[in-house]
Amino acid sequence: MPSTPLPDDVETLKALLQQRDEELQSLRQTVSTLELALSVRTLEIEQLTLQIAKLNRMMFGRKSEKIDKKLEQLETRLEDLIAEEGADEQIDPVAAPPRQKSVHKPFPENLPREERIIEPQEDACPQCGGNLKPLGEDVSEQLEIIESAFKVIRNVRTKKACACCDCIVQAPAPSRPIQRGFAGPGLLANIAVSKFADHQPLYRQAMIHARRGVELDPATTGRWMGACGVLITPLVEALHRYVVASGKIHTDDTPMPVLAPGNGKTKTGRLWVYVRDDRNSGSEEAPAAWFAYSANRQGLHPQSHLAGFAGVLQADAYAGYNKIFIDGSVIEAACWAHARRKIYDLHAKKVTPTTKEILRRIGELYAIEAQIRGQPPDERKRIRQLQTRPLIDDLEVWLRNRLLTLSTQSETTKAINYMLNQWHALIYYCDNGLAEIDNNIAENQLRGCCLGRKNFLFLGADSGGERAAAMYSLIGTAKLNGIDPEAYLRYVFTYIADHPINRIDELLPWNITEKLVGQIH
């Protein structure tokens, strides 16, 4: 672009310089304003992210519509702020303020690739007209999604007749997951995962399918899920046997509203989870999660679920477990996360020297666990005896001394007494390298169920709770083993009807990983 000729007159030049100085100053002020706005927005995003994380921690395990509403508001605001950044870049990529570049992991190798060769439009050099020769190429990848599509599989069984007699031959009809049902195994797996993993009620799924021109009545898909629950019963029982054969089990439970028959009101059922997962102590045995439903929270249910189990039971301080520990074959290990949460809730309301100090000391215990994660049990026990035990002994003395200075009616006193009342179970993990510092392994398995409870509002009947527990068992175990639950259920629904019942263990997730190559996370 040619430069504008400068005038010869000195006064005119001075005026021009003055004008440009003023324009430059204005631009600097604009840049400063934009930088300030960007800083404010970046700070707001960081604050929103922290608040959302905090509310997520607070939301689990308690009923709070205020927290849910606040969380939704913050997430919506955060989405809007991030969307504004994307809109700014889309409108003017050059003028958009710089931001920290997102680093994404390479796309999985098993994803299909569609290569598009983009050739230059020029056939000859645009400057001199010379011939063009290959120089190299620039490659960029874009992630796209292809809409899942329905298809109809027509099984045509031809008949053949003997030319010499009346004999007719025909291949047997292929088995179906559901007798006289028209749903294929892939469709059944998709419906099950959409409901129990993605928390989409059947009526919402019906609306989604209707947009694609396929009418699937929720009553029909509901019957399919009932039939699938029966189909997978032997497999879920095998999973149960595998879990209770472990030397350590993590357990937890959560309420499940259930529609009471006759009066239209809801009662409170219970969903229990029992997890076998020793990977933190270096085990290569497959992790597994078995869920069970009960109509109430009576202690007889976990006693029945754990019949035949001997080992360490990591749980909260629920009194319903007490009878399990009586004969000594099952040893109680408590959860430091539960104990810490009671202190943290008080600390979040009002920071005090007591709550601050307790959280700091518990943080030291967790720091040691982070260092020994994945080590064999003997090494974990050695480090805990050397480093953790002195800290815990000192913490106990400090807590008991602190109680002498606190009101017996204070919330802090109650939280400290909660810890001291189960102190033996809390410190047990120091003496057993297989045990964990907390019960988060079980709590994590229940998070998805809590999301589903929020979407479904209630279960239709106790039988619905039992079906949900069965599906949660297979889906949760598939996830623990890094397997796509939909791919796993598709395989199960394809073969389980014809699979020998005495070899049902062959269909457990870790036994079919080689058959699901490309679908392991």
Whereabouts are the PLM-identified features?
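Short, flexible loop/hinge motifs at secondary-structure junctions
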Residues: 1-182, 250-251, 257, 285-288, ...
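Catalytic center-proximal scaffold of phosphoryl-transfer enzymes
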Residues: 3, 18, 25, 46-47, ...
